[in-house]
Amino acid sequence: RSDDLAISERHHGLVPSNERGRSQTHIDRMARLHRDAVELPEQRTHPASATAPPAVVSASPADHRETDRVRIAYASDSAFGFYYAGDLEALQAAAAELVPFSPLRDRDLPACDGLFLGGGFPETHMDGLEQNSSMRAAVAAFIERGGAVYAECGGLMYLADSLTWEGKTRKMAGVIPAEVVMHPKPQGRGYVRLRETAAHPWPLSGDGSEAISAHEFHYSALRQVPEGLDFAYRVERGQGLDGVHDGIVYRNLLASYAHLRDTRSHPWAKRFVDFVRRCRVA
């Protein structure tokens, strides 16, 4: 056993690499220890018998006309970093140019046609998120102008009025009229099954006939949620926002606890890019 191999943990599991800052150094250390302790030539003489599944070939961004292309800014810093690489690639294949930005450090949004606010740990960075009032205002203004925005879990939390954790409350973007409160135990964890409603801004089926498979893992829950909100999903399995609904819809924003995965049966990335294209704002 070596303490050099330990990886920090907290309420959601391992501390993600976008927060550690020295992840590559840690990986290099593990590689050296493995090289010194394991007979690699012996391993090479016994290759695994299983073969990798065939890769899914997507259209290249170069296959699209320049007029089809859109710029999607996505939150990427130590507070927000949960994205599937395959989903980002699917967005690019659908003619999206992805532009990272930091809700913690940047003062304004980059020039963009749409926003993708992914998962992360806004609760551990809520002081910095509150202090960056210019970015919170920029995100809120983009949504109010009708910009297309997709937010998952941590992104949803950032868009609420406030975030409370360990007895402290900090202001967030103030787009979703509700408070987010962290709890000691998970409020939603595992696979979810959803049905789209007529309010979904970029639906798969439009009539709710297709079940949407996704997953959730959140210690937070919404409080003081007003009546009359529109929801994109009915929850058939899982928790979502309240055990019945998920996916708050406001203007051209969809914000949910569910994490989608772009697949053949549920190609959400292209549908979102098409929606961004239809909603371009000046």
Where are these regions (language model features)?
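G-domain G4 guanine-recognition motif of GTPases
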Residues: 1-5, 76-78, 218
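Cysteine-nucleophile active-site neighborhood
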Residues: 122-201
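Phosphate-binding active sites in nucleotide-utilizing proteins
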Residues: 68-133, 137-144
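C-terminal and late-domain segments of enzyme folds
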Residues: 67-68, 80-99, 110, 182, ...
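Short acidic, glycine/serine/threonine-rich loops at helix termini
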Residues: 6-13, 85-87, 127, 161-162, ...
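Internal gly/pro-rich beta-alpha loop/helix module
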Residues: 1-64
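Hydrophobic, well-ordered secondary-structure elements that form the walls
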Residues: 115, 152, 173-176, 217, ...
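Structural motif
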Residues: 31-34, 75-78, 257-260
